[in-house]
Regions:
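Hydrophobic alpha-helical transmembrane segments
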Residues: 1-127
Length: 127
């Protein structure tokens, strides 16, 4: 519902593509950040099987959405979107570490969804 509200807040259909691309890319970057920051909660499972990304992979996964956001939406909107995703991801990561001892596939997917929802909330307030 938050995604639908975010898209419907964009009155010009051609403007919908830029936030859609940025939100999708940045929320996936948040997953890579969680994979790097949190240990696997279990030895088996998708979180452990995926492994831990190296620093270069993390830098690429985080830098590309930021550059894309600045290029497509401007620096102010980019900062608001990336900031919202960062806050949501960090809070989710802290909760996952406390509740589960680290990341699982579900934790990574939940982090992506929360980062995306946080950014769509920003889109609805800025447009």
């Amino acid at each position: 519902l938050i995604r639908i509200a975010g898209l419907s807040a964009l009155w010009n259909p051609t403007l919908q593509i830029a936030p859609l691309v940025v939100v999708a890319a940045a929320s996936r970057g948040a997953m890579v950040g969680l994979m790097r920051a949190l240990p696997p909660a279990r030895r088996e499972g998708l979180g452990a099987a995926a492994g831990r990304p190296d620093a270069t992979s993390l830098a690429i996964a985080l830098a590309l959405p930021v550059l894309l956001a600045v290029a497509l939406l401007g620096p102010v909107t980019a900062c608001a979107l990336i900031g919202a995703a960062l806050v949501a991801t960090v809070l989710w990561g802290l909760a996952a570490r406390r509740l589960f001892g680290g990341q699982t596939g579900d934790v990574l997917g939940g982090g992506q969804q929360l980062a995306e929802a946080a950014m769509w909330l920003v889109v609805t307030t800025l447009r």
